[in-house]
Design a protein with these regions (language model features):
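C-terminal beta-strand-rich structural cap/linker in extracellular carbohydrate-active enzymes
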Residues: 710, 718, 751-769
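Extracytoplasmic
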Residues: 20-207
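N-terminal module-boundary/linker segments of secreted carbohydrate-active enzymes
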Residues: 204-224
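Aromatic-lined, polymer-binding surfaces characteristic
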Residues: 226, 230-461
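Extended polysaccharide-engagement surfaces of secreted carbohydrate-active enzymes
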Residues: 73, 452-743, 758
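Solvent-exposed beta-hairpin/edge-strand motifs
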Residues: 95-104, 735-750
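Bacterial Sec-dependent N-terminal signal peptides
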Residues: 1-20
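Solvent-exposed beta-strand/loop surfaces of large extracellular or lumenal domains
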Residues: 110-128, 698, 739-754
Length: 769
């Protein structure tokens, strides 16, 4: 196959002008005349009257259950010389859990999971913007339209996917329900789709505060926790690691049935001893315990937590002996110390790069070492060493990787930080919901506290936690909950590791419904005024009880354990004075531009408009010149993949896109036989890799796809982002415009033809046509 350069010089070298938006073609689904004029055919689809009494088509599941469902095929007009885009119109009150993929000339556009060219839709069962329409835009492969006036397109439907599935059956679910409706399809050359004024649009309703549920959910919470604790205490068999941790944590909670219960210590001693006996038969148990999810990360961290929590109760028994299962007597102290040492040896040599994984591994490593210091101080690592690992994992000092016989591996060199200077996680760029790690950093901070004294933790970790929290606050946008009440949601559309997070989860400060998180944990732990303000905003919107109620629907011991401290945290926050802080995107708050040049992401509040953009977008292997946009207005939402202009230092190396259609980053799960990628053979340039960094073409690498400068024009917005530390770039203004305002400088009127963009800074302009 002839290889195609995707840098698209025709597009990137074009003069930036503002022209009246015009569609090349419009297809109205359910309108027989419109469908006939587009050579429309379908399989397993139906027409219905949907939002605002408009006609739509939705794809239906097959009569015999299958992972794939209905299809819509059609032909549309395109521009033969320019980059063309395809947009669909969907109604925001509709919800599904289906996946919709675009096909062009019989080949799949984009990837099914975390691709730089995204899928059309992956529903999460929630309505994203009730009562209004939203538009999703993808680029049509240039090689399918160059020199042509028409292109054959198709939308195919599939069941939902679970991104962590290791088999096709666990990854790809059958399609059992109809998809959301597709109302219209459009082709156009301007990346920011502008609907015709005649199209019906909804409006944001006046959002009310929900009245229920209320404080009664805390009673339900206590019932669940206490019932599970009673079940654990009634066991005559050894407890799992997570049960030990839960029990030890509950020992100091006054409203539980195990509060200062003497039998707790004996249960835990019996259970750790049993774990040790199994460890003697299989030393890998410290990192392969099947009762612990992500066992390689947690190691024997839960046991170490139990030891630390209850050391005052356990120490009197530490030097007593028990039978190790092989007819030999050993003290509890010696046996448990062996477990901690084995865990330390494994975790120090198996550290991981991705931020949340690094944090979890290093946190439980730290806990194991603290437990070892209680049991056998002479064999514990120095406190400064394990604390250094924590500092590395949260971006206070450079992350140096796993330990080797020659010292730290340093796979990313000497200066790679896990967080940006402004406090965002990097995987490799901006991470939305998946990158929300405040709960883990709170847990890390608590691990450094003296047990029973919550404000004695490492001061640098606390300060980093608060920086992260304030930065994350820009990525909460005003919306409504599933019942139409006022709520703030997390921005994840432009996140590298996020799929099916539109709409984002209801979030104010902490991730309310993550397994190990609570809605108020940062605020209750730090009592920082901004954190308390976020917590109070959540409580005032009555979303706190709603989130607790939702968490009660979740199953699993880690969820139940996380419920343990919610009542006390709520009591602490209710005692605080009103804080003078609201989330920045809250209606009525001042306009702003936030940018993070290391992650290549911006968040803009401009009156009633909100713009989120990842300019550095899923460029794992090479420069792709792609951005992802979530543009929120009072009447519509827009989600778009678009090509932008970049400047970078070319390594001379090239990455050729393989024929992958599932994961954009791996061939490991290519289960969709007979489907070919529309991007196979596309050639992408690779940015210069710093000296000393191990790299081969095709590797995921934080330097391979990162550019020095990004320039994006999207609708009325023009963005220039300078990611260098020592270069200055010029951002040219579009021609043929009336006025230009610099949003980065309080909407200052721009009179120059270009603006300097200083190192590590971003300029956002708003152009009036």
């Amino acid at each position: 196959m002839k290889k195609t350069i995707i840098t698209l010089l025709l597009i990137l070298l074009a003069t930036y002008t503002f022209a009246q938006f015009k569609c090349n073609d419009i297809l109205q689904f359910g309108n027989l005349k419109s469908e006939a004029s587009h050579a429309f055919t379908s399989r397993q689809s139906g027409v219905y009257k949907g939002g605002l009494n408009e006609t739509a088509r939705r794809m239906l599941p097959k009569e015999v259950p299958s992972y794939d469902g209905g299809t819509l095929a059609f032909r549309m007009k395109v521009d033969p010389a320019k980059q063309n885009y395809f947009t669909v119109r969907c109604f925001g009150s509709e919800k599904d859990k289906s996946m919709l993929m675009l096909f062009s000339e019989g080949k799949q556009v984009g990837y099914r999971h975390l691709g730089d060219i995204d899928l059309l839709s992956l529903g999460n069962g929630e309505a994203p913007i009730a009562g209004r329409y939203y538009y999703v835009t993808l680029p049509i492969p240039l090689k399918h339209t160059i020199g042509k006036k028409e292109v054959n397109l198709e939308i195919r439907s599939y069941g939902e996917i679970w991104g962590y599935g290791e088999t096709f059956e666990s990854y790809q679910k059958n399609m059992v329900d109809p998809t959301l409706g597709i109302y219209k399809a459009y082709t156009h050359t301007e990346p920011c789709f502008v609907p015709n004024k005649d199209e019906k649009q909804g409006v944001v309703p006046e959002l009310k505060i929900r009245k229920t549920p209320g404080v009664e959910v805390l009673d339900a919470l206590k019932n669940r926790v206490n019932n599970e604790l009673n079940d654990i205490m009634a066991k005559t068999t050894p407890l799992s690691q997570l049960e030990m941790w839960f029990l030890a944590d509950a020992y100091s909670v006054t409203w539980t049935p195990v509060y200062q219960n003497r039998n707790v210590a004996s249960q835990i001693i019996f259970s750790i001893d049993d774990f040790y006996k199994r460890f003697l038969n299989d030393s890998s148990l410290v990192y392969s315990d099947k009762q612990v999810y992500n066992n390689e990360w947690l190691i024997t961290g839960p046991i170490s937590r139990a030891i630390r929590k209850l050391w005052k109760q356990l120490e009197p028994f530490a030097d007593r002996t028990f039978d190790n299962g092989k007819g030999q007597l050993i003290t509890h102290r010696k046996a448990w110390a062996e477990l901690m040492q084995a865990s330390l040896k494994y975790s120090t040599t198996h550290r991981r790069q991705y931020t949340n994984q690094s944090m979890i591994i290093d946190m439980f490593m730290y806990d194991c070492n603290k437990a070892l210091a209680l049991l056998d101080p002479k064999n514990a690592l120095p406190e400064y060493q394990t604390l250094k690992y924590l500092h590395e994992s949260i971006g206070l000092t450079p992350w140096l990787g796993r330990e080797t016989l020659k010292g730290p591996e340093k796979p990313l060199g000497d200066n790679y930080l896990q967080l940006t200077h402004k406090g965002l996680t990097k995987e490799l760029g901006f991470v939305g919901y998946y990158g929300e790690v405040l709960d883990w950093v709170v847990d890390i901070y608590k691990s450094t506290c003296v047990p029973g004294f919550p404000s004695t933790g490492d001061a640098q970790i606390r300060e980093q936690l608060l920086k992260m929290m304030r930065t994350r606050s820009y990525f909460r946008y005003p919306s409504q909950d599933e019942n139409g009440y006022r709520a703030m949601r997390i921005e994840a559309v432009v996140g590298w590791r996020d799929a099916s997070h539109y709409p984002g989860n209801i979030t104010y400060g902490d991730r309310a419904i993550a397994w190990d998180a609570t809605p108020l944990m940062t605020a209750a732990t730090t009592l920082d005024s901004c954190a308390v303000g976020m917590a109070q905003q959540m409580i005032n919107d009555n979303q706190f009880f709603n989130m607790v109620d939702k968490k009660l629907e979740m199953k699993g011991i880690r969820v139940t354990k996380s419920l343990l401290h919610i009542p006390d945290e709520y009591e602490v926050i209710m005692k605080q004075k009103p804080a003078n802080f609201q989330l920045p995107m809250t209606k009525g708050m001042p306009d702003f531009v936030f940018s993070d040049e290391e992650d290549g992401v911006i968040a803009v509040k401009n009156g009633d408009e909100i713009l989120y953009v990842s300019l550095y977008w899923r460029a794992r292997n090479a420069v792709n010149n792609l951005a992802k946009v979530h543009y929120i207005t009072p009447t519509i939402d827009r989600i778009a993949n678009l090509y932008i202009k970049t400047d970078f230092e070319d390594s001379g190396l090239r990455y050729v896109r393989p024929n992958w259609v599932n994961l954009a980053f791996s061939s490991g799960r290519e289960w969709y036989k007979g489907i070919n990628s529309a991007h196979e053979g596309d050639i992408l340039p690779i940015a210069k890799i710093p000296d000393g960094i191990k790299y081969k073409i095709g590797d995921e690498n934080s330097f391979a796809g990162k550019c020095n400068f990004y320039r994006m024009q999207y609708g009325n917005y023009v963005v220039g982002m300078n990611c260098t530390k020592d270069k200055t770039y010029q951002l040219s203004l579009p021609v043929s415009v009336k006025q230009t305002f610099n949003l980065s400088e309080n909407k200052k009127l721009v009179k120059e033809k270009s603006i300097k963009v200083a190192p590590m800074s971003t300029v956002v302009l708003y152009v009036v046509k």
